[in-house]
């Protein structure tokens, strides 16, 4: 079931963010460097795929860099937070690198995203298969695609995708 597979992918993404963020928060509050962390990519590559794990790690690093920049400027800010928790529910989301997904729009719009081998095995996908999902709605802009962020809205029981694009100067 594609929905279950996507939910598992989003849950693993949130788990990666939370584990990495927990280690960085502990180091921060202990007065240590937040940049020396375990290699979480290796722990999650089988479920998320290498590029997706890398994107989540990069987004977490960027969140910490923003925190330190604001902190340095004297802003009253808190360290990056968690994407929910296992008991009360995680904020289910993931980030797909711009060269790792394809979006086709038209009469039957769809997006194809990579998943790790463990999820492929669990859900019966072939080695080269990707998760193919129907897309509703149409992009407001077209241009060079950025990374794709997918979030699950539990209240509406729907998935939302956010895709930044770079629009050429001549069309702005």
Question: What are the functions of these language-model segments?
Answer:
Residues 1-172:
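Nucleic-acid substrate recognition interfaces
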């Amino acid at each position: 079931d594609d929905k279950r597979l996507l939910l598992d992918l989003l849950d693993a993404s949130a788990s990666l963010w939370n584990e990495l963020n927990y280690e960085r928060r502990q180091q921060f509050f202990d007065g240590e460097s937040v940049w020396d962390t375990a290699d979480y990519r290796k722990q999650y590559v089988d479920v998320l795929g290498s590029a997706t794990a890398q994107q989540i790690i990069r987004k977490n690093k960027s969140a910490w860099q923003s925190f330190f920049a604001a902190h340095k400027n004297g802003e009253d800010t808190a360290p990056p937070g968690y994407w929910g928790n296992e008991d009360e529910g995680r904020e289910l989301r993931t980030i797909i690198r711009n060269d790792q997904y394809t979006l086709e729009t038209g009469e039957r719009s769809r997006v194809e995203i990579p998943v790790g081998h463990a999820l492929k095995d669990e859900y019966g996908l072939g080695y080269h298969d990707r998760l193919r999902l129907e897309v509703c709605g149409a992009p407001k802009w077209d241009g060079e695609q950025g990374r794709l962020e997918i979030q699950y809205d539990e209240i509406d029981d729907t998935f939302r995708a956010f895709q930044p694009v770079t629009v050429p100067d001549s069309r702005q």
